[in-house]
Amino acid sequence: MKVRIRYFASVREALSSSGEAVDTAAGTLAALRDELIARGGAYASALARGKAVRMALDQAMSDEAAALSDDCEVAFFPPVTGG
């Protein structure tokens, strides 16, 4: 399936990319994250397990168990605080 990925803030800076479209067999956010980590290099560092990275699916905050669908939008970003 095709998935649109967007990267924000420090994740965007680490990957030198604001986003990409990928073909994936991943069924969940967790599986997609693992596919990206497996690329190695900046992806492994920016999206590493244990690193504080938040995810959104179709512009709604989601946990790793969220199911992907064809042509969905996934976003990766660091935690954000406000005041």
PLM segments and residue spans:
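Ubiquitin-like/PB1-type beta-grasp interaction modules and other compact soluble beta-rich domains
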Residues: 1-81
